[in-house]
Amino acid sequence: MRRMPRFRGGKVVFLRSVWYTVKLCAYFVRFGVELLVRRPRTRQARAEWLHRFCASALRGFDIVVSIEGEFPQHGALIANHLSYLDIVVFAALHPCVYCAKAEMEHWPVLGWMTTMAGTVYIARGRGGSALKAKSGMQAAVDAGLPVVFFPEGTTSNGDELLPFHSGLLAQALGTGMPVTAAFIQYSFDRKNAGATIVEDVSFWGDMPMLPHIFRFLGLRGIHATVRFAERPIAFVSDAKRRKSAAREAQAAVQELADSDRTVEV
């Protein structure tokens, strides 16, 4: 397993990580109690709960989000994938439903959060997973919620887009829903001694999750930038030509990566 970098920043940064870990636990207690008391049963209610949770967490941890364009109100949203923080950012911007790999269900913290929010988990290679994805997407759209997924299938260090997988994209196209591209990236607005976006914000490879989260919580001035395409992707390929459709989708996200106009929210 790839080792995390030595804890940098000294005692002050370490104590900040401890404090924000306690604060994060308090958020889970607060919103967990709300979940138990209100018992949201519909997809819309659960998505609204996740939206409030994530928006509150970003404010509480002083994470700034800048956007260009608008979150699509319906259909599917696809984006590059850098970190567990991506999930929090997109959910904070708009109520939505995620389609994600089954392993995410067992992630500490985020696994519980996304499960309670009605995430559609997909076990690749298992029989019936494609049908489950398609029916889950359709149910979300029928409830008036956009569906979010990351076609790279895993996180990266952000140097370049990984090849897009075609499975979930084919299921989205098979329902006839529009698919809109987005691009997310991170930067620091304040100095963080020895920290880098690649090692301390992006979560990729075989980095151990809990040590990474602890270090992440000690950072200051994290700034997320999200760009949304102006309109859904005009696919030439259909669900039956899913590999070609995946390349078209990747090109749409890459186009956003190459642009640089943002508005702080």
Predicted regions and their residues:
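Catalytic core of membrane glycerolipid acyltransferases/transacylases, capturing the structured
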Residues: Y27-P40, R59-G60, Q73-G128
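Generic beta-sheet signal
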Residues: K101, I122, F150, A182-I184
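A cross-family acyltransferase "interaction/gating" segment
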Residues: L110-G111, D159-K240
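C-terminal/domain-terminus segments
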Residues: V236-D260
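Soluble extracytoplasmic domains of inner/organellar membrane proteins
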Residues: A130, M137-Q138, L145-V147, P151-F164, ...
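Residue-level preference for the first positions of well-ordered beta-strands
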Residues: H74-A76, T119, G144-F150, P178
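A transmembrane-helix-recognition feature enriched in membrane-embedded lipid enzymes
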Residues: R2-I67, W112-A117
